[in-house]
Structures are given as C-alpha cells and as structure tokens.
Amino acid sequence: MSKRLRELEKQVRALTEEVTRLRPENLALREENLRLAARVAELEERLGQNSRNTSKPPSSDPPSLLPPPPKTGSGRKPGGQPGHRGHQRELVPETDVDEIIPVKPTQCRDCGAALRGEDPAPRRHQVAEIPQIKPRITEYRLHALCCGRCNAVTTASLPQGVPPGAFGPRVVAMVSLLTSFYRLGRRSAAEAMRDLFGLTMSLGSVTACERIASAVLAGPVAQAQAYVKEQGVKQADETSWYEGSARKTVWLWVAFTEQVTVFLIRASRGTDVAKDLLGQGLGVLVTDRWCAYTWWPLKWRQLCWAHLKRHFQAFVEAGGQARRIGGALLVEEKLLFEWWYRVRDGTLARSTLRAYTVALRRRVKALLRRGSVCGHRKTEATCRELLKLEPAMWTFVRLAGVSPTNNASERAIRRGVIWRKLCFGTHSEAGSRFAERMLTVTATLRQQGRGVVDYLTSSIEASLRGERPQSLLPMTAANVA
C-alpha cells in the first residue's frame, strides 16, 4: 500500500512540475491567440471596406460587393408621360441665322394644281453645320535696313501683340484646353489639332503652349485664391496626385465657393497647405474629418454628413453592440436629411428645422457616447473623435447657406482625379502649376457660365499687349478689385 502511495505521490509531483512548466507556455499561446484573432478581425474589416462604409471611391469596390437593392419601380412606362410637355432643341433666333432658304410646295398634294402665295408662319427647320476650318497664316517679314549715314543695320521688331512663337493666342488656348480639361495626352492633342483644324504641331510645341498659358494665368489664379480666402462659406477636399517621372505622390487640394473654385498641388497633405489654401479661419468651412482642418474654429466648421453616414455604416458592419449603435445613428441621419431636403426645397422653415433638431441632437450624442465604450476598437475611436467635434455636426442647422456635405468640392476635384488616372499626373513642378491653374480656370468659368476658350484667348492677347489678363472673379467682385 505504501509503495502504491509513493508511486502516486511521484506521479503527482511530475504532473505538478509539468503544469508549472506548461502554464507560462499556455499563457503565451493564449496571448498569441488573442493577438492573431485581433489581427484576423482587423484584416477582415479591411477587406470589408468599400465606398459605402469608407471614403474609398466606388471604382475601388471589389466585384464581390453586392450591388445596392434595386429601387422600387413606379409602374409607369419609360419615356414621356401623358400630359408631359416634351423637350426639343430650341431654334436659334432669326438674327443669328446665316442663311434662310424658303421652301415652297409647287403643286397641290391632292389634285396637282399649281400653288402660289406666301405662308405667313412657315414651319422652321434649322440645320447646324461647322464649315471646314483652315488656319489663318500671317507672315511678318522683318526687314533689316542699312543706315546711309552711319552704315548701322537695323532690323524691324514684331508689332505689339504679335506672339514671338509660331502659334497665336487661340491656338494656345485650344491646345491648353485639350491637354487639361479634356485630358488628352500631348500626342493626342497634336493629332486633334491636325484632324480638326489642319494645323501640324510637334510635341514640343504643345508643351510650349501649356507653358505660355500657365504664365498668363498665374495672376488671375492668384487673385482667385485671395478671393476664396475671404468668402463666408467654403468647402475643401484633397486627393492624391502624381508628379515626376518616378510618379512621386503629392496632393491635389480644392477649395470650392459659390462662384470661384481654386486648386493647389503640393507635396504635403498637412495643415500648412490647408492654411495656404483657405486663409486664416474666416467664415464657415465644410470638410471631412481629416486632421489638416482641425485648426479651423470649431464653431465655424461643418463636418460632412455623407462621410458620417459611411462611418455609421461601418459601425453596422463591425457587428456586436457597434452594429446596434450604427443602425440607430443611420435612422437619425435619414430623419435629419428628410427635414433638410424640405428646408432646401422651401417647404420647411429653418427655424422649424432648428426646433426639430434639438431632440435629435441629444439622441445622436447619447449614441456616440455609447459607441465610445462599445468594445469595438475602431468604433470607439471614431465615436470619441466625433464627440470632440460634435458641435461641427450641426452648423448647417444654425446658419443659412451652409451645406451639410462637402459634395460640391468632391465633384469639383473629381475632374482632377480622372486627369490623374488617364494622364498619370504631371511630369514636373511646372506641369503641376499648369494643372492647378487650368483646373481653377475651367471650374470657375463653368460655375459663372463664361466661355473658357474666349477667356483664355483674350487673356493671352492682353498679355501680348502688355496688359493685365481678364479677371476670374464674378463681375461685381472684379470691379471692386
């Protein structure tokens, strides 16, 4: 019996030693398992990121992402509805018609009798056509004459307003527009000038046209930048850009106002560039939560609710308590925008919106507090930051003229994004200056309903005469300036 006890005691000691030895190993394995589980969750969450729950563009969505549910049909047939007034091309005023050709029937369609007379209101049919375009070539013969008194030879200079290069202002304007707004490569732009206008150009000539336009636009663009800084409401956004043969990543910035939009291309995405673009905190600024804008006074800042909606959707997809909080926030967001659309359409007074929003704001703040301790790390971090910025979620309710989203600035910068994707950015700093200036000019002129080619042509002509180029500012602001 004692021998059996001694064997059991020996086994117990061995097992105790083994447990003691394995306990740290087990603890280490448990810690490693927790780390790996957290890493897997992080990677799965990253794989689940798309344009609906982050700021990623829809073009980056994977094929596996299910499309949004189809909208419920109205039950009506496609096309114009009964009673709907049709749309058709408007006729050009008779004063702008180049040629009028009367067309009269010669005989009756029933009996064949000859027809005479005038129709006081004939049916008008207009056909627009572009005539064959041929470049107008002007040759300047600069004579060199010898003085009969001192034998000095004097060569004539080009008259004022004549460009020193081979191409005139309108050619420079059109080439610059093709390589910027229409995003053609230099070779394609040269081919377009040959096919459309019968004008042969080298790639070097295309680059020279860009350089001329960029230099002429420097003054008007600087004036537009100063104008934007002084505006009471502006939106801002930024996106990546490529510069140089190595495709170094730099940043394209935009500041949008009601009448003027300006762009900058800079190496940084930081606060210094934001201050250079926007000024010193004057007026209301509508942006996303990017840290470069945190210096702007919170009282005069509006967070973009389109971005907030995507954050709330990310809460839902995180699962657990974050899912319930995100769903509740999406319900509040939908209700808020139903009210906002009515204010925008004029069917709800802003004072009523302010009254409605009081209780909704309390509910949103309570949900964010719950989210800050929900147990999901990213949801907690986002909710804590939103609680710090919470006053900036409601500026559009308080002030007229402020949008709840920065969608206008995102639409403006989208043309730059497409340019970057098609042309791979710019090859030099000079190219970046050309890009930011042409983006500023084309966006601003289109906002104001002004012609881009005519503006560029007149500005280059003014520069050749030694005069200031035409202003980009709205007429009233330009007159003051």
Language model segments and positions:
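Short, flexible loop/hinge motifs at secondary-structure junctions
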Residues: 1-166, 235-236, 242, 287
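Catalytic center-proximal scaffold of phosphoryl-transfer enzymes
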Residues: 20, 35, 41, 88-91, ...
